[in-house]
Amino acid sequence: MGIEPNEHRLLRRLEGKLKVERMPYFLSILLVAMGQSVFAAEKIPSDTQNLKKGKAFTLAVLPDTQFYCDTRLKLSKKWGNGDLRRYFFEQTRWVRDNQKRLNIAFLVHEGDIVQADAPEEWAIAKEAMSILDGKVPYCMCLGNHDMGFEKADNKYGGNIGVNRTTHFNTYFPREKFAKRQEFGGTYPPDRHDNSWYHFEAAGMKFLIISLECKPRDEVLAWANKVVAKNSEHRVIVLTHAYMNKGKSRNTGGMSAKGNTGEQTWQKFVKKHKNIFMVLCGHHAGEAVRTDAGDHGNLVHQVLSDYQHLNNGGESWLRYMVFEPNENKIKVYTYNPVLNKFRNLPSSRFDLSYPMKRAE
């Protein structure tokens, strides 16, 4: 199928239905009026000597992929998207193929992996993610679409996130990931719903802790222990529904009982001086906010989700280049199908973060 790689399609999508992303829309109009494109076709940036020498590294981020796996629901038929799995495959292939070039140390998936916790959807996700096996280590978090699906006669074909049941553990079993050197542990001990992983890059130790959508109190208690016990690691928190595009942490929503984004911040994130970032999806759009934790450490909270764009996201992803010598994390939003970057202020930005200089 042909793809229209220009800003006009994005503006049409943003207009009307996507009022939730007003500021990027107006910025887009301004950019076009000034003769600038919303997109930028350019060489992969930050392809520097620091990356080649291991003095800098990259974290890859996959936002919601639910539409890429949706082959059966009424919503997909309504939008006329058809089978979109190729976009998921293009994402993971691109990450695999650019692992050495960008020194990609790890990949995270922000949840809503599938649309309605259906086996046929999980089979697509498994095939897409397996492209990374043995090449790029990764972890995933559960979104509301990944659990608790109940059939119903509505436009979505059912209700999602009503409980904690999920097929995730069948297709991404704990025992598979427990064999990997980056594996740290899970909660509950016999399931993969919540997990933590660790890796070293550019002379620093990092820990990624993945929390279920609306993590329960017992999950946050476990997470507090993991982070406290690994105080020498720099920690990134991965959870699905945490913050909206208005930069407010979630205070409600969804049927499953558990902690909101604000409660997760209060009960867990802000308590630890080694937590410096939270990554989330769920809400269509982009947003960043930075707050000080209880120990004065700055915590960057970053939302990215492109399911509202054409073809359920059309393979837009993020990657973050950690540059210790500059004490910066450089964030890029890239489309491997179009070979283009989004150059909106909310899409391409730098985050300050003190790191050990990699000599």
What are these regions (language model features)?
Residues 61-63, 106-112, 137-143, 211, ...:
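Active-site neighborhood of phospho(di)ester-bond hydrolases with catalytic His/Asp-centered motifs
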Residues 55-58, 101-106, 133-139, 201-207, ...:
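Loop/turn elements at helix/coil->beta-strand transitions in domains of secreted/extracellular proteins
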Residues 53, 318-359:
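A short C-terminal boundary segment appended to hydrolase-like catalytic domains
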Residues 256-325:
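Conserved beta-sheet core of the metallophosphoesterase superfamily
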Residues 80, 218-221, 228-276:
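Active-site-proximal segments of metal-dependent phosphoesterases and phosphodiesterases across multiple
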Residues 41-120, 359:
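N-terminal active-site segment of His-dependent metallophosphoesterases
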Residues 68-70, 115-117, 142-151, 192-195, ...:
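Active-site environment of divalent metal-dependent phosphoester hydrolases
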Residues 47, 77-78, 118-221, 271, ...:
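Extended active-site neighborhood of metal-dependent phosphoesterases/phosphodiesterases
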